[in-house]
Amino acid sequence: MELTISSKKIGNPLLVELLRKLTVSFNRMHREFYVIGATARDIILKQVVGSESKRRTMDLDIAIAIPNWETFAEVQDVLVADGFEKSRDFKQRFYYREYELDIVPYGNVAKDNDIIYWPPEEDIAMSVKGFDEVLSNSITVSIDNEFSVKIASLHGLFVLKLDAWVDRNLVTSKDAEDMSF
């Protein structure tokens, strides 16, 4: 599915700037990303369904397929060179002005059962089940006919949230709450 939308309809100039900047950076690296999480939900609900989410967010979650952790380090270096600030506390997190950017790697970097283990200690584990399938069913969104981003579909977001809930339902109810959108 493909959509063409106006940045004015997104209603968040900083988000559009961030998406444009990410697109330029990832194109230069010859890498693909797609938007997941609440921002994907909000864009799709507003553009396709015509309703807005009750919860606003100032964070952006993206997924990238990488073969190994060295590639993630290369992505990190390019983003920092392009003006993103790397979090000192969270391995997946970057900052762009007021936005938090979380990058979820998947693909060959995952180990058995589609689990990633953040280096070097590998003590933080995260399930990335279904990420390939969600990408293959993503929506390509052209913004102002200037650049395009891939966004997880609503059913893809539900699959990712369901897996996250199964993975961490004893720790948090956030994923179940997010599935109720």
Could you say what each language-model-derived stretch is?
Residues 1-181:
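Compositionally biased terminal segments of proteins
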